[in-house]
Amino acid sequence: MGNTKWTDEQLSAIETRNCNLLVAAAAGSGKTAVLVERIIRIITNEENPVDIDKLLVVTFTNAAAAEMRERIADAISKELENNPRSKNLQRQLTLLNRANITTMHSFCLDVIKNNYHRIDLDPSFRIGDQTEGILIKSEVIEELFEDKYEEEDIGFTNLVEIFSSYKNDNNLKNLVLDLYNFTMSGPWPEKWLINSAEAFNIKQLDELDRTNWVRVLAQSVKIELDGYVKMLEKAIEVTSKTDGLEPYMDNLLMELSYIKKAYESTDNGLEAMFNSLSSVQFSRLKSIKKDKVSDELSQNTVKKIRDDVKKGISELLNNAYSVNPQQMLRNIQGSYPYIKKLIELVLEFSARFSKRKRERNILDFNDLEHLCLKILSDYDDENNIIPSSIAMNFKEYFDEVLVDEYQDSNNVQETIINLVSRKNDDNPNVFMVGDVKQSIYRFRQAKPELFIEKYNTYDSSNGVNRKIQLYKNFRSRREIIDGVNYIFKEVMSEVVGELEYTDEEALNLGADFKENKFKDTIVGGPIEVNIIDKSHNETVVEDNEEQEEINNVILEGRIVAKRIKELMSKSEDEQIFKVLDKESGEYRPLKYRDIVILLRATKNWSEPLLDELSAEGIPVYADTGSGYFESIEIRTIISLLKVVDNPMQDIPVISVMRSPIMGFSAEEISDIRLVKKDNYFYENIKYISEEAYNSINESYSDVLIAKCKYFINSVDKWRNKSIYMAIDEFIWYLYMDTAYYGYVGAMPNGVLRQANLKILFQRARQFEKTSFKGLFNFINFINKLIKSSGDMGSAQVLGENEDVVRIMSIHKSKGLEFPVVFLCGLGKNFNLMDLNKSILYHDELGLGPDFIDIGKRFSIGTLAKESIKKKMKFETLSEEMRILYVACTRAKEKLIMTGTVGNLEKSAEKWLGSASLDYNRISPSEVLKGKSYLDWICMSLCQHRDGSVLSESFGTENLILKDDNSRWKVSFWNKGDLIDKTKTEVLEQGEGYELTIINNKPYDNYLYEEVDKILSYKYPFKASTTIKSNISVSDLKRRHAEEDYDTEQLYREKVKVVPKFLQEKKGLTPSEKGTAVHFVMKKIDFNRVSSTEEIKEQLHELFEKEFLLSEELKVINPTKILSFFRSDLGKKILDLNCRGEKIYREIPFYTEISSLEVDKTLDNIYKDEKIRLQGIIDCFFEYKGDIILIDYKTDYIMEGHEDEFKEKYRKQLDYYSDAIFKLTGKKVKYKYLYSFYLEKEIKII
């Protein structure tokens, strides 16, 4: 291909033939160029040319297939320029149009179209829209459940009882749909479902020991125990080096021996593992006087390590090994009946869904792969799957099968490739290229294991199965490459990442960046890590996680804006940052379009970042991939469509009224509402319109009457039009008839808004091709699309060369490159929410349910669930590791990272602890403990000489630092440093005003009397001014409890300033203790309250996150909290939680009461004076149709005085009950006080 200079490895990948070849192509190694060159050389081989249509080239996306076809066409054209008479080249250019350069779905579609008769398929079938599929599924699942209810099948009834809430059966329906969707990513879904159910049909413990569940659980426990061994060995090392800690040594050595024994037992079955773990004991450490220890810091380090090991062993015993092996077996056996019934339900749904699609003659994308498999596969006499005659034809026809982005293949695609290729024959012909370190689509059921299995078994030199590694990176500067290599050698392993990042995997510099010889030019530079510490200047603990995340974005956005401005302008030394121009080969000043900001997810991040950068005058664009249905123009049109379909809907009607289409003012809408409050808005509009026509009602303005008449006439006209017009035509008609299309074009971002409206029109056109028709179905279609998170994303109106900073997700950046990359949000925790589902599923391990005893209303995780949970966590974190790799390797010349932590000192202590266990690398068990990208990065940097700032600032010991080639710049930022001080500065500067006499003429007597009258005025309702407009329930309760009170004193602000020298800390007051307990009950995870150990663990987590003070942690008794969850009320809450029902905690409310309820000494003239009552309801929930209210109390109370206690708080609970009724429309049936002092519930009613 021209004069390209290929490396030896690239050349080998291009020229190697007659084998299955796996090319492991690292980021920026030129894999696409290699793939294209290989194809060109195959079709232009002088001795044995192959026609291009005899190659099957499988790509990941349609865009990639189009790009591949274009590249091949360009290459052939260039060859033709050198050899214009070549008939072979002319032939290949002609054949290119029918070449099999395609996605797997497109290939499957071609196979089906050419062989439809073999599967009894109507040849006029069409591919259904994704949302059309959702609508059909919804129809089928509703019909299926209705039939099952009519059959009164006890097995189905039990499923409903287990998985559904008291309100509806949506949880079970969603489970059936999710499980169906999951299985369709496998080649044989029916077989997988049946085998997954039968896996629970186990009779003996030795059968359970042989399952994959036990194997995976043993592997994961082994990793954890290995980490605990390293931790205790570190503690022993510190103890041996610290004078005075000798008394700890015996305990540590004994505990280490216990854990090593448990480690060795992991391969000996469940009984051995359970017994070994249960025998691990931690004796009380001997006390040591402070003056006997040479280094108190070392003593604290040893204690903390030991406490962490104890906590880890406790977690194993409370989760995976919470019951003995025999009970584990019984729980598996007990789950079999309902799992079998669930699978039967999924299979019946699958059959009905397939039948419904056949009736409508449509296929979905899953059908393409599975019907293709049906055509390509057959069975031998022993019922083994073999290639069909059609597949055999493909084997003979295709000279070579080339698979791009092989790391993203799934099991279905792998099976199809195996059937149409000679992969397993004597003359293999499959070429696979990809980079498993960039496999980031597991959520689409991609299987990186397929790549890894071949990578570990294929030979590097010869044989029928070979591999070649392309390790040279032609994209990035050395600073980027060295930095990426350093981090991933530290943290990527077979455990987290599913691949060891060895020297073989490391990137090698391949790009030629010319030397900078200009003193006024800055190029490259170290990778920057900016860590924001939120613990400084923090006055309020942010309780709203979404708002806290937005606050983090704002802080990081300010750092990003600051650095962009610095990079784009000259420094104090008159130097300017430059990047290498690809075309000229010379350094040029940085442009905004050279910069990208990468995010793990754009939700809650892109908008605040846009605002921050825009405020600093930085042109910026965010491709969020969402927000389409939230745009004002789309919301308005959808509301208009809803009104046309059914005008008896107040919210859409008001939306249209307030829009430019109708132009009603807020006052006019208010007038319409007051016509008849119980009517629909549309009825009131029609009433005003008709009264105006009959000249009966003259109380409305002519303008309002005219608007109402126009509204009614327009809606009537549009409703008539909608009956006979296609939905796409009707939508375009609305755009034109209302002039709304032109109106939005004149708004800010008008081009984008019009493009959004065009997308809706095109979506309607696609809808017209579905089996659903009419306006109602289209609205339902849009609602389903929104509900299924199928936001279409705003229209793209940004040109590729627009000079703006781009904000995008890491996934969208894959395959792209940018001179400067900002990687933000690194402190955000990984999303592991999927691990908390009631039932887990895994393609290898099957189903992982809870064992549920319906009679006792009790549930516990099964061995299967614990095993799958461990496996899913490893796989999820491995995926996150690869996503971080993709993000870092997008940078060509500069990489800048930002992340926020709640408390830098605590985070640094954790990072340094992880880094200190193993000098060679971060232990996989420590990597597994990482909760964010920032954890992984900073653990690694703690061992780097440039990360010494971490150990110097927060270190507990002297770490041996690595002299690695990578260069880093670690910076710390306090929250206060980034808060906008503009307002403060203005207030401090102030402005001086000179007072002058405007008019000094003498006043007359009349004026004097008027002024005196005004100044002497006495307010007739002075008594009401003594009462605040707001009052809390607690104050009101206290007011009713006091016979003698001073109203003014009760509601006047009380400020008691105690001098610091008189402030004496005497522990928490009863009120402070109560506040702490209430906070814990608000935050506690109901899934982890089965033991005091689990509750203690949660309390420590709240302390570590700084939600609890150390004093509060000491006074909260986990045993008393456990007692609550073992009470009848607690059991009801856990039952609801198990079902996914809503439990309302710490619900603030506001309501109005008469001022006479506050102060009965007021005259009756104040009875209509309203005061806002505010309070917080501790807990309420709906249980079997009844609303139950709980108020937590930590007061001291004597046994036997419960009646007095009830009377004390009765009025308070009455207020709460009224508030709940106003919130829910349902009356409270039962009111309870729960006394943590007595550890009992006290029923009010």
Swiss-Prot record:
InterPro entries linked: AddA, DNA_helicase_UvrD-like_C, DNA_helicase_UvrD/REP, P-loop_NTPase, PDDEXK-like_dom_sf, PDDEXK_AddAB-type, Restrct_endonuc-II-like, UvrD-like_ATP-bd
Domain of life: Bacteria
Cofactor requirements of the protein: Mg(2+)
Family according to the record: Belongs to the helicase family. AddA subfamily.
Annotated EC: 3.1.-.-, 5.6.2.4
MF-aspect GO terms: 3'-5' DNA helicase activity; 3'-5' exonuclease activity; ATP binding; ATP hydrolysis activity; double-stranded DNA binding
Record carries keyword Cytoplasm: no
Listed name of the protein: ATP-dependent helicase/nuclease subunit A
Alphabetical keyword list: ATP-binding, DNA damage, DNA repair, DNA-binding, Exonuclease, Helicase, Hydrolase, Isomerase, Nuclease, Nucleotide-binding
Residues that, per the record, bind ATP: A25, A26, A27, G28, S29, G30, K31, T32
Residue stretches making up the UvrD-like helicase C-terminal domain: 517-815
Assembly with partners or alone: Heterodimer of AddA and AddB/RexB.
GO biological process terms held by the UniProt record: double-strand break repair via homologous recombination
Function: The heterodimer acts as both an ATP-dependent DNA helicase and an ATP-dependent, dual-direction single-stranded exonuclease. Recognizes the chi site generating a DNA molecule suitable for the initiation of homologous recombination. The AddA nuclease domain is required for chi fragment generation; this subunit has the helicase and 3' -> 5' nuclease activities.
Residue ranges occupied by any UvrD-like helicase ATP-binding domain in the UniProt entry: 4-477
Keyword set includes GTP-binding: no
Pfam family membership, one: UvrD-helicase
Source organism: Clostridium beijerinckii (strain ATCC 51743 / NCIMB 8052) (Clostridium acetobutylicum)
Signal sequence extent: none
Name of the gene: addA
A GO CC term assigned to this protein in UniProt: cytosol
